[in-house]
Amino acid sequence: MGDHNLPDFQTCLKFSVTAKKSFLCMYRDSVSKEKLASSMPSTCDIQLKRAINDAYPGGGIKVTVLNSTTASLDSLATTHVKEFEIVIIPDINSLLQPDQAKLVKIMRDCTVAIEKAQSTRIFIGVVHWNNPVQPSGAAKDGDEAGKPAPKTRIFLPTSFRMGAWLKHKFWFACAPPYLDFESSTESSINTRANNSIGMAEEEKQEPESKRSIILNEEANLNDVFVGSTVRRYILDIMVHLRTHRLTYNAKAGGVYTNSLDDVVLLSRLIGLHSGKMFVSPSHVKEASRWYFPMHLELVQRSSMDSSLLYGSDPNLVDEMLEKLAKIKCEEVNEFENPLFLESLVVKNVLSKVVPPV
């Protein structure tokens, strides 16, 4: 992936199956028909199900499309998994808060079952996003034309309408499998350039061979060495993200305590995918670009900026956020990435934190 592009779906699927982790898929509502992979309907769950079946044909992976209803969540909670199951949630943003709480409990129970080696079930949540017109289309709660913008004006709305406790159950967000990735050719990870070739070679293998590859990667994952200096490097990145000028300090910038373990795991996968049995700072940088943009909580309005406590003018903060909203609106269309600004924050932090030698 490029610095500001979403990770590709195929690699994310491979990593998530190996690590037994759930992830999100960012689906743009206004995607054009020219970008579809086939003449099939553009329903996201159909495309995802086909992509998974193509990646693991007959490989012992069951794909279930979940209806966003309370009844389907209840049935999912009582269903016992006998094989590797991937559950697709078509529109996770539409879940009501009680349903989100049920889904969190189900995912927590699945994590416990995975740790006990009883069963394996991961989730793919589909997030529908759109790029609103900025800045004139920024939300004003009860504000009349010609009056100064109130503190409730949101300049940088987020694409996620779910609770943070649910969002943190997913470890990163990726692009849909049917988008054109020609703009993503400049990848900082060497293996991404050969990804399409590797996928084509894997599809030619027998299902048993493909399943054995997954098991071998799971067995080798813990053997990938992570030095203490690399862990300290990840912690330095987390601290700088929490205290960044654009992150919401009241929520620690969205960087929570489990981020260290998740980034270490993702770095190990990237290192193993690169043919290495150790994690280098370049692997950590790539993992950070994958992981942190989805979790970051950015300042959306001047009242969320902690610098107001030290004398900053709210109107000047609003002007800065309004200019950032214009830049975000333009770049989101170019990169097809609703998390462009979050990716920019991660890139800025990576340029400031000195990696271990």
UniProtKB/Swiss-Prot annotation:
It comes from the Eukaryota. Disruption phenotype: Decreases resistance to doxorubicin. Belongs to the MTC2 family. May be involved in telomere capping. This is Maintenance of telomere capping protein 2. It comes from Saccharomyces cerevisiae (strain ATCC 204508 / S288c) (Baker's yeast).
